[in-house]
């Protein structure tokens, strides 16, 4: 069994080694021929990777913040409580009270009639 698979494995390994050597040779040749350009390209590549990591971290943090704020009680929760501690229901309740009180306050026309009489 080892004799059947070993030629295949050795062929695979030799192909991989050949590809690796040719790639390393090409890289070495490019770096030797254009050292400045290669350095600039590598620098840009590294900067892009760093920026991508920072953006991913910021995006992840915002997503976590949004998820932590998500579980809010439904609007019916505020209606069931006699005195809600949140501003909006109290604000609307005060407005309703003020509008109901305004019906007892005489209008400008009624005040003018009272002043003339």
UniProtKB/Swiss-Prot annotation:
Subcellular location per the Swiss-Prot or TrEMBL entry: Virion membrane; Host endoplasmic reticulum membrane
Q: Which family does it belong to?
A: Belongs to the asfivirus minor capsid protein p17 family.
Q: How does it sit in the membrane?
A: Single-pass membrane protein
Quaternary form?
Interacts with the minor capsid protein M1249L and with the hexon capsid protein p72 capsomers; these interactions form a rigid zipper structure that stabilizes the capsomers. Interacts with host STING1.
Gene Ontology annotations for the cellular component aspect, listed alphabetically:
host cell endoplasmic reticulum membrane; membrane; virion membrane
UniProt-annotated glycosylation sites, renumbered to this chain:
12, 97
Question: Quick one: a GO biological-process term for this protein?
Answer: symbiont-mediated suppression of host innate immune response
Chief location bin? virion
Name recorded for this polypeptide = Minor capsid protein p17
The species this protein belongs to is African swine fever virus (isolate Tick/South Africa/Pretoriuskop Pr4/1996) (ASFV)
Entry superkingdom? Viruses
Quick one: where's region Disordered? 96-117
Instruction: Please explain the role this protein plays, according to its UniProt record.
Output: Together with the penton and the other minor capsid proteins (M1249L, p49), forms a complicated network immediately below the outer capsid shell, stabilizing the whole capsid. Three copies of p17 encircle each p72 capsomer in the inner capsid shell, anchoring p72 capsomers on the inner membrane. Required for the assembly of the capsid and icosahedral morphogenesis. Additionally, inhibits the host cGAS-STING pathway through its interaction with STING1 and subsequent interference of the recruitment of downstream components TBK1 and IKBKE.
Per its record, what triggers expression of this gene product?
Expressed in the late phase of the viral replicative cycle.
Q: Where are the transmembrane segments?
A: 39-59
Keywords assigned by UniProt, alphabetized: Glycoprotein, Host endoplasmic reticulum, Host membrane, Host-virus interaction, Inhibition of host innate immune response by virus, Late protein, Membrane, Transmembrane, Transmembrane helix, Viral immunoevasion, Virion
